[in-house]
Curated annotation (Swiss-Prot):
Assembly and binders: Monomer.
The protein's role, per its UniProt record: Catalyzes the transfer of a dimethylallyl group onto the adenine at position 37 in tRNAs that read codons beginning with uridine, leading to the formation of N6-(dimethylallyl)adenosine (i(6)A).
Chemical reaction(s) catalysed: adenosine(37) in tRNA + dimethylallyl diphosphate = N(6)-dimethylallyladenosine(37) in tRNA + diphosphate
Matches recorded under InterPro entries: Dimethylallyltransferase, IPT, P-loop_NTPase
Site positions for Interaction with substrate tRNA: 106, 127
Name of the protein in its database record: tRNA dimethylallyltransferase
A Pfam family of this chain: IPPT
Residues holding substrate: 12-17
Cofactor requirements of the protein: Mg(2+)
Entry's Gene Ontology molecular function annotations: ATP binding; tRNA dimethylallyltransferase activity
Binding residues for ATP: 10-17
Keyword terms: ATP-binding, Magnesium, Nucleotide-binding, Transferase, tRNA processing
Organism per entry: Bifidobacterium longum (strain NCC 2705)
Length: 328
């Protein structure tokens, strides 16, 4: 048997934090140590507590959490940097006999920790040169070049989207490999099992409405007011923070600001379900099922026994990849 990393995924407000803690406690009852590794990009920022639904002090005391409150809001967290930190943390925990439980928001971040994904980086000089060529030669000429260098990537990309064509050519020049070689693969590089939390849309929308109200009650306006001078270009993109900045500037009233937060959170949740739904390795469970934790533990036991390995090994065959920007 191989002790798997447990990755808990699903839309915002679906209860991932609670399930992660419940699994860790259940494992502890069986004599196995487990700790949580955060995969939510914005929960890594110090002080961004209410707006990111960061685990409370009590929750973090119940089960040790990693990669929370590790950078200041002025700093930048990239998925490539997170990948390095997450894999180092997972390796350290496993070396001490502790099972990592990955709990996260962004699908790309959660996958970056455990999947076959590389991030080639960028070169401003190469990017600028390609952008100048697009202006002088046209998007069609660049796409023809991509088609000659990487037919697989070109076959799946929209020739009317020069930004992605430029990115693909940039990666080819930087790596000397086809752009398609850098695409995310549905292939674990760390033995893992993914558990997804699913809710009917009305139930999820209700949870989001309750969370948004709780953000107001907990002092989200005051949090943003305090953090505003320190929010960098990345941190300020966390959902809800710009709405409160606009509220403080008199652009929104309080009701409209929080209504917009709720609406955009619901939209994000639907996008997240689309993202996670493309991964055939995820074992979906009903978040409101009273036997949720029991069902999750059964999945973990099957994964540790290798029961899912034959299906997981073929996951890439069933998946159409979305050719987006893979950047540092």
């Amino acid at each position: 048997m191989t002790q798997r990393v447990v990755s808990i995924v699903g839309p915002t407000a679906s209860g991932k934090t609670g399930l992660g803690i419940a699994i860790a406690r259940r494992l502890a009852e069986a004599g196995e140590r487990a700790e949580i590794v955060n995969a939510d990009a914005y929960q890594m920022y110090r002080g961004m507590d209410i707006g990111t639904a960061k685990p409370t002090a009590e929750e973090q005391a119940a089960v040790p959490h990693h990669l929370i409150d590790i950078i200041d809001p002025e700093d930048t967290m990239s998925v490539a940097r997170f990948q390095q930190l997450a894999r180092e943390t997972i390796a350290d925990l496993q070396s001490r006999g502790i099972r990592p439980i990955l709990v996260g928001g962004s699908g790309l971040y959660a996958r970056a920790a455990i999947d076959d994904i590389t991030f080639p980086g960028t070169d401003p000089d190469v990017r600028t040169r390609l952008e100048e060529r697009e202006k002088t030669e046209g998007a069609g000429a660049l796409f023809d070049e991509l088609r000659a260098k990487d037919p697989e990537a070109a076959a799946r990309m929209d020739p009317r989207n020069p930004r992605r064509t430029i990115r693909a050519l940039e990666v080819i020049e930087l790596t000397g490999k086809p752009y398609s070689a850098s695409l995310p693969r549905y292939r674990y590089v760390i033995p893992s099992v993914q558990i997804g939390l699913d809710l009917d849309r009305p139930d999820l929308d209700h949870r989001i409405d309750l969370r948004t109200k709780q953000m107001y009650d907990d002092g989200f306006i005051e949090e943003v007011e305090r953090l505003r001078p320190h929010l960098g270009a990345t941190a300020v993109r966390a959902l809800g923070y710009q709405q409160i900045i606009d509220l403080l500037d008199g652009i929104w009233d309080v009701n409209d600001a929080f209504a917009d937060i709720a609406q955009k959170t619901k939209r994000l949740a639907r996008k997240q379900m689309g993202w996670f739904g493309r991964d055939p390795r995820i074992h979906w469970l009903q978040a409101l099922n009273p036997k949720l934790v029991d069902n999750a533990m059964a999945i973990i036991a099957h994964a540790d026994a290798g029961d899912y390995d034959p299906i997981d090994a073929r996951a890439d065959e069933y998946t159409q990849h979305h050719l987006g920007d893979i950047t540092a």
